[in-house]
Structures are given as structure tokens and as C-alpha cells.
């Protein structure tokens, strides 16, 4: 193998290694930023991964909201009318958060089956519900009042 060919080979191998490293970094960054949506039924059935950031959504069960008297800790239960999953959250809930209405919580599922949320999103008017929640409710055979998703 002559020296010029050897030089080209090393250059091509170096470029391929650089591209592979760049693709690896890009995939790693994308994987960390993906938040997949899971219904309470999927979470209860063990389909949601533990200690990975997920979005859990459904209707807040009536009578399930428990506020701590001395901190901002809140605990409530979200249901898709098939199964339910408890959610804990530390912070101020959105003004539109109410029992019996649709929410999406972003957080991690722990080993006890509780979603530890770091963000809670509530629907923004009476007729809107997140598309994922609407789909989950339709699949469970329930229909929420005024739950048509609008862009």
C-alpha cells in the first residue's frame, strides 16, 4: 500500500469515526428529551418504564385531591375510567386544575407505581382536552363532556 493510499484510508476512517460519534451524541440527546404519553391503564399494566421521564394523562378523580397543610406537596389520582394511577406533585397547581377535569403530568414513575410529577398541565378551557387524553378516554369506552380536541 503506497503512502498516499494509506493517508486517504486513515482520513476516511477518521471521518467515519467522527460521524459515528456525532450521531451517537445526537441520538443520546434526543432520547433524553422524548417524553412518551401513557394512560393510567398502560401505567397500571406495567407498560411505562420506571425512572424515565413520561407524560401521564387522564381525568382527575373526584375526591382524590390531597394537599399538604405545611408544604406545596399535592397528591391526586388520575383515571381513564378503566384504571387509576396516583400522582404526587410539589409546587403550585395551574389555576384551571380541578377534580373531574383532564390533565397531563410530566414526571417519572417510581417502583411503587406512583408518578412523581415535576410539571402538571391542565386543560385551558371547557371544550379543550389534550388529544392524548381524548384518545385514551375513547379507547376505554368513556366520553368526557366537551372533550373534543381542537387545534
From Swiss-Prot:
Its Gene Ontology cellular component terms are: plasma membrane
Name the source organism. Answer: Pseudomonas putida (strain W619)
What spans does the record annotate as topological domain Cytoplasmic, numbered to this chain? 1-8
Bilayer topology term: Single-pass type II membrane protein
Q: Which residues lie on this side of the membrane: Periplasmic?
A: 30-151
Q: Which InterPro entries match?
A: CcmE, CcmE-like_sf, NA-bd_OB-fold
User: Which subcellular locations apply to this protein?
Assistant: Cell inner membrane
Q: What is the protein's name according to its record? A: Cytochrome c-type biogenesis protein CcmE
Amino acid at each position: 500500500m503506497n503512502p498516499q493510499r494509506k493517508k486517504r484510508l486513515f482520513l476516511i476512517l477518521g471521518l467515519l469515526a467522527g460521524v459515528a460519534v456525532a450521531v451517537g451524541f445526537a441520538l443520546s440527546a434526543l432520547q433524553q428529551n422524548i417524553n412518551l404519553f401513557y394512560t393510567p391503564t398502560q401505567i397500571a399494566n406495567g407498560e411505562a418504564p420506571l425512572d424515565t421521564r413520561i407524560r401521564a394523562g387522564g381525568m382527575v378523580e373526584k375526591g382524590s385531591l390531597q394537599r399538604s397543610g405545611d408544604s406545596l406537596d399535592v397528591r391526586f389520582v388520575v383515571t381513564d375510567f378503566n384504571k387509576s394511577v396516583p400522582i404526587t406533585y410539589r409546587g403550585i397547581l395551574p389555576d384551571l386544575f380541578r377534580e373531574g377535569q383532564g390533565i397531563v403530568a410530566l414526571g417519572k414513575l417510581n417502583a411503587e407505581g406512583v408518578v412523581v410529577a415535576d410539571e402538571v398541565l391542565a386543560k385551558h378551557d371547557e371544550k379543550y382536552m389534550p388529544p392524548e387524553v381524548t384518545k385514551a378516554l375513547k379507547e376505554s369506552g368513556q366520553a368526557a363532556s366537551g372533550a373534543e380536541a381542537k387545534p
